[in-house]
Amino acid sequence: MSLSLAELEEVLRERRREAPPGSYSATLLSDPERVSRKLLEESFELGVELMRPEVDRERVASEAADVLFHTLAGLVGAGVPLDAVLEELAERRGRPRPE
């Protein structure tokens, strides 16, 4: 079973809207500072895993999942749709890099 980023985005929007008791996502989405702190923490942890001399693919996948989850939570919290990010990436494709 797989979950697309768009599906995860929709789940997060639903959690924000409904705020079910005990939901980690709902709690996270109610506090933008907490989302930011978690994103920084998870990004750091992913970076650490990627710097290891022998990369543990399972750990990298786990940390990358945390980064993607918290990135989407931040986007949902800020009202920025995933499509806006994908459009930005598409616009960058083929654009010369600044020197």
Residue ranges: model-predicted function:
Residues 1-64, 68-99:
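Flexible "arm" and connector segments at domain edges
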